[in-house]
Each structure stands twice: as structure tokens, then as C-alpha cells.
Amino acid sequence: MKLNSQAKFLNGKGVVNMAKIVIKNEILEMMLYIWDSVHQKEKISDSFFLEIADNPNMKYLYDGEEFTTESVRKVLSAISNRELLNKPTKKESRFWSKNMWMLEDLGFTNMMVEPVKQLNLTDLEDKLPKDEYEVVFIPGHMDEYYIDGNKLIINFFSIVIDFFGDGPATIADKPIKEYIEEKLLSM
């Protein structure tokens, strides 16, 4: 086993303690359910929208004024009811349009989701100095990513796919895995 300078030894016995990276895409899975249900013209309860809005990983989107938990409920409810938003803020409007974009072609949406579901970051674990990291995908509105302690929160809508299938999915013109590695190393 090759050790790097960031490896830690436990109990002086030469046991390597590498970082652990946890990928969280629960919110993304919930959004897939919403997009599919709306596409199938099924009704979704506002309580489900509130469950998404109340998820602790969604807090990075909230600013207390332009975008709140109520914004998430309002936007997703409007989408579910096939309605336009009444007097939306800029962030609500962006969140609405990004979600509507997902509904245009579920095949395209699934192409964006596939690299997230297949993401394996175990080969990065020996490169990282902290013990544990979280990589979280959320349906954001404006920002590409957020960093909070050992947590990297990525706006799912920042993923760009190659329609022809020749190239990898990217974020900010970098393959997703490379992008994540760069962000994790900067933490």
C-alpha cells in the first residue's frame, strides 16, 4: 500500500486512516420523483415539497428574503399545477425555469443524473487531509457550489452533458470527478 504525506497512523501500529467521502443525492432522488410525477400528470402533495424544502442541505439556497423554504414549496407547487409564478423573485424565477427545463425531456434529465449516480470517489480518499467529507447534490438556483466545513454542496443544474455521448459530464468545463477533487482539496 502506498502512503502519502497526508496519511495518518493510528495507535502507532501502521494502520492507515484515509478520508471517507460520502455522496448524498437524496434530494436529487426526490426531485426525480417530482419531475417524473409532473411529467405523468400526477398530483403531488405540498407536504412532499416541504419535506424537500426543510432538508438541512437545502439551507444553502436560503437567504431569508429572495429565496426561502416557502419559495421551494411555491415554485414546486406551481410546477406541479402547471402554473406560472405570481410575482417571483429573481431566485424563485431561476429555480422555476431550471426545474421546468428538467421537464422538457426526461431522457436529458436522466443523462444528467446518471453520472451522479455512478460517481465513485474512493480513489480520492487517500489524497484528502480531513477524516470525512460530504458531497451533496441539490437543485440550486444561482450558485454553482457551496462549501461549509467538510461539506461540498453542488448545484445539480450546473452539470453539463455531451448530447452525443462522446465526452464526460462536466461542471465548469471540467469532468465532474476532477471538479469535485479540486473543490475538496481546496477545503
Predicted regions span which residues?
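Intrinsically disordered, low-complexity coil segments
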Residues: 12-15, 164-168
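Auxiliary, metal-adjacent structural segments of Zn-dependent hydrolase domains
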Residues: 92-164
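Charged/polar, solvent-exposed surface patches and flexible loops
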Residues: 50-51, 60, 74, 122-126, ...
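Active-site recognition of the HExxH zinc-binding catalytic motif
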Residues: 165-187
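N-terminal low-structure segments adjacent to metalloprotease catalytic domains
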Residues: 2-111
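General "foldedness" signal
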Residues: 41-44, 48, 147-151, 166-168
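Generic surface-pattern signal
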Residues: 54, 77, 81, 126-130, ...
